[in-house]
């Protein structure tokens, strides 16, 4: 990308550390781990890329780099009919700004299972992340993503969920740390009766850049989506971007969708860009 493309027009490319154009030094590290003790019906393992093929397509430049560089995939699986009472904690902590980690992660919740997963991101690092989520028929998943990075972190991530028949997916994104955070929480419905809720809060202070770029693909009938993001900004050159894009395809009769973004500017010199989009095929 050059910055002239619609998907990149707000992003300060020079601050991405080369993760978008192939000039980053690729780190050989896996900073994601499962916190706490083992849980019945839940497995977390590192697989080779050939053992964990991609679950979705993406035209994002950084996702393309991740899939080129990442030789292993962290896979979390929740077995069918498992109801996990306590939240599952995934922790990512790193302290290396000299190279970039290109990370592939897959979360698979099987049919009729129910769970809450918390991803806690801390430390100072450069991270490119492709997180794919598969929500099987009748499953119910809540995913909480906490960006609590230190001041110099650059984090570019995609969080893409495929939601099947009568399944429910809730995403809660909290972004308060890092120098630059660019997240793509996206959803595609693969069968009728699916629903999603994308919620987010962010607080940017002096010099921080936070971009949250939503896309919900209503490709089947009778699916429901709710998007609600709220932000606050304080300090010179604090900058946030929210893009909310809902695509209703011709076959998606009975679609129920809603999106909202609100921002509170607490000082001069801060800027919040908000762009809602609704596309009907």
Identify the function of each model-found stretch.
Residues 1-57, 61-67:
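Long, low-complexity, mixed-charge
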Residues 51-281:
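Conserved beta-strand/loop scaffold segments within soluble protein domains that form the structured core
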